[in-house]
């Protein structure tokens, strides 16, 4: 019952926004956990630099920075590399820190019916192996593992709706399934607000969580966008469920191989 009320409340909060800016376009991707079929465009960069905080009972984890680099090859292909620097404290123990697993990947948008039509992509990524020291600190997984996801987006009335489903093939780590849903709309020419539900299930291991978050993007200027998100678990807080998770960062859009700032 609490889950249904939370979902209904979040969707209603977005539905009550009063203005739509036709030039804006809601999407998944940072600051959200769910990805979408969008790509930067040929020879363009999308760089996301952020801080991700997750707090659960007895454990606080910070990804500072969380680096997400994306480069467009043609209009439908994106090369990606993601990696966080993790600071983690647990049960009063000393803070552990270091680089965690990297995530190189390639996104291909194989269906594109325009901004108002269906768009679909696949975005395979590799969770790379981490150093022995990082694994001993508990800030990285052994790796490698292989993520095979599918992303779908469609405009429904004033809302942009994104869905992602994926599966981690077991390499050195558990099999894991992810499901993500993002819906949102522009509020002004500068501000976009979205709601996300994200479900992450691993076989016989953590994580096993469903989270709800609200977030958005605010255009600061040409090629610069502020990113923000805050949420929590919908399953209670036992078993390592996040009592709070949040993201704050900036998106930098560059065109012509990075020579100029680009527009969204």
Label for each model-derived stretch:
Residues 14-24:
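C-terminal segment of classical bacterial N-terminal signal peptides
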Residues 5-6, 20, 49:
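N-terminal cationic leader/targeting segments used for protein routing and processing
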């Amino acid at each position: 019952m609490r889950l249904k009320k939370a979902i209904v409340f979040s969707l209603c909060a977005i539905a009550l926004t009063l203005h739509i800016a036709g030039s804006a376009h809601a999407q998944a991707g940072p600051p959200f956990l769910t990805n979408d079929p969008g790509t930067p465009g040929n020879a363009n960069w999308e760089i996301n630099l952020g801080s991700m905080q997750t707090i659960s009972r007895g454990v606080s984890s910070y990804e500072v920075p969380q680096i997400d680099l994306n480069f467009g090859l043609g209009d439908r292909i994106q090369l990606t590399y993601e990696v966080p620097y993790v600071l983690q404290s647990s049960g009063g123990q000393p803070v552990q820190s270091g680089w965690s697993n990297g995530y190189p990947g390639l996104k291909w948008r194989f269906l594109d019916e325009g901004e108002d039509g269906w768009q679909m992509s696949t975005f395979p990524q590799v969770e790379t192996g981490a150093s022995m020291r990082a694994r001993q600190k508990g800030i990285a997984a052994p790796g490698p593992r292989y993520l095979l996801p599918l992303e779908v987006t469609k405009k429904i009335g004033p809302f942009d709706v994104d869905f992602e489903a994926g599966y981690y093939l077991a390499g050195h780590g558990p099999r894991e399934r992810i499901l993500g849903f993002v819906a949102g709309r522009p509020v002004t020419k500068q501000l976009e607000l979205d709601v996300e539900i994200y479900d992450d299930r691993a076989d016989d291991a953590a994580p096993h969580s469903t989270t709800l978050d609200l977030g958005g993007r605010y255009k600061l200027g040409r090629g610069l966008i502020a990113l923000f998100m805050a949420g929590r678990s919908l399953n209670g807080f036992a078993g390592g469920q996040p009592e709070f998770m949040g993201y704050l960062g900036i998106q930098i859009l560059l065109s012509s191989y990075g020579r100029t700032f680009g527009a969204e």
